[in-house]
């Protein structure tokens, strides 16, 4: 929990040791965050989600590369329903080491294969970004990118509704890690890209 003052007044040996630890992967650089009620939340080791002390993460993903435009809503609602159903049945709170599911009300649905999905419809990141911007402003784009942005917006909205109905305080995450994507294929048999990353 280093803040600006602590860093400013730390001696050079301490700074060097911290930077070395971050560079070698032994120390994670993470922001100090609070939930909407002002309670401290902490970055998980993967840095994909922030959790309360003794909180756990329950993550799943939607493989966009395995979806068509017409599949998105069902993929997101099914995945969120599965997460919310599994949430109370993990037994993770029984040990006393972690928060119980009645207290720790969060799941994390992420996505992978965005570039695979966009490739299928010949949509550039630029066009998709512009279409998303318009959709977020309440407008629409009358092209393939606009159709994809609207379909994704509806799918995420419907999944969020399921999370709300299950009293989840968080429903989405930057998940999963890259290793999940490399084991996933798109509709054409190509390896999926991680998270929402472009191909490398």
Named regions from a protein language model:
Residues 1-200:
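Long, C-terminal-biased catalytic regions of enzyme "large/alpha" subunits
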């Amino acid at each position: 929990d280093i803040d600006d003052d602590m860093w400013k007044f730390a001696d050079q040996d301490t700074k060097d040791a911290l930077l070395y630890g971050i560079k070698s992967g032994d120390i994670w650089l993470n922001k100090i965050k609070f939930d909407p009620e002002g309670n401290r939340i902490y970055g998980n080791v993967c840095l994909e989600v922030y959790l309360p002390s003794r909180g756990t993460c329950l993550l799943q993903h939607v493989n966009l590369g395995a979806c068509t435009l017409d599949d998105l809503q069902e993929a997101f609602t099914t995945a969120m329903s599965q997460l919310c159903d599994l949430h109370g049945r993990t037994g993770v709170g029984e040990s006393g080491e972690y928060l119980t599911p009645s207290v720790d009300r969060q799941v994390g649905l992420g996505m992978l294969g965005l570039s695979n999905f966009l490739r299928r419809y010949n949509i550039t990141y630029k066009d998709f970004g512009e279409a998303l911007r318009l959709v977020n402003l309440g407008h629409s784009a009358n092209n393939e990118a606009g159709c994809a942005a609207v379909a994704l917006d509806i799918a995420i909205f419907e999944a969020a509704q399921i999370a709300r109905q299950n009293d989840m305080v968080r429903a989405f995450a930057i998940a999963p890690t890259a290793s999940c994507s490399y084991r996933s294929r798109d509709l054409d048999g190509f390896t999926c890209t991680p998270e929402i990353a472009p191909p490398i």
